[in-house]
Curated annotation (Swiss-Prot):
GO terms for biological process: protein transport; vesicle-mediated transport. Its main location: Golgi. Keywords: Golgi apparatus, Membrane, Protein transport, Transport. Gene3D superfamilies: 3.30.450.60. Belongs to the adaptor complexes small subunit family. One of its GO terms (cellular component) is AP-4 adaptor complex. Adaptor protein complex 4 (AP-4) is a heterotetramer composed of two large adaptins (epsilon-type subunit AP4E1 and beta-type subunit AP4B1), a medium adaptin (mu-type subunit AP4M1) and a small adaptin (sigma-type AP4S1). It comes from Bos taurus. InterPro entries: AP_complex_ssu, AP_mu_sigma_su, Longin-like_dom_sf. It is a peripheral membrane protein. The keyword Membrane applies. The keyword Membrane applies. This is AP-4 complex subunit sigma-1. Component of the adaptor protein complex 4 (AP-4). Adaptor protein complexes are vesicle coat components involved both in vesicle formation and cargo selection. They control the vesicular transport of proteins in different trafficking pathways. AP-4 forms a non clathrin-associated coat on vesicles departing the trans-Golgi network (TGN) and may be involved in the targeting of proteins from the trans-Golgi network (TGN) to the endosomal-lysosomal system.
Length: 144
């Protein structure tokens, strides 16, 4: 099960955070700081899976952005690693080569995409067309 999903830039600034288990606000800040430090300090040659406290971190870097997913011990690391790539491909489809600015200025749409893909910490959809369908309908409604 996915515990949290983070998008972070190289400077360590959180661009998106989504928690699927309750974590108090003051503990979230500490958790994010430690997780970000753990991922940013690693070299490209090191594995993208990290054992951290009572869960695993799986991360991928795309240009200046890192996507970090915290999961429980029973989750398949490779499945989450590919899920991260699928998420970025969906963002690329919607934004036509997504950038950090797209995420910052369209955070609501990024949350909709993530909510279409993950429900209560479980991956429920990976088909790009089905994931983007609600957003395309919203875009049509706002255009008219």
């Amino acid at each position: 099960m996915i515990k949290f999903f983070l998008m972070v830039n190289k400077q360590g600034q959180t661009r998106l955070s989504k928690y699927y288990e309750h974590v108090e606000i003051n503990k979230r800040t500490l958790l994010e700081t430690e997780v970000i430090k753990s991922c940013l300090s690693r070299s490209n040659e090191q594995c993208s899976f990290i054992e951290y406290k009572d869960f695993k971190l799986i991360y991928r870097q795309y240009a200046a952005l890192f996507i970090v997913v915290g999961v429980n011990d029973t989750e398949n690391e490779m499945a989450i690693y590919e899920f991260i790539h699928n998420f970025v491909e969906v963002l690329d489809d919607y934004f036509s080569r997504v950038s950090e600015l797209d995420i910052m200025f369209n955070l609501d749409k990024v949350h909709i995409i993530l909510d279409e893909m993950v429900l209560n910490g479980c991956i429920v959809e990976t088909n790009r067309a089905r994931i983007l369908a609600p957003l395309l309908i919203l875009d049509k409604m706002s255009d008219s």
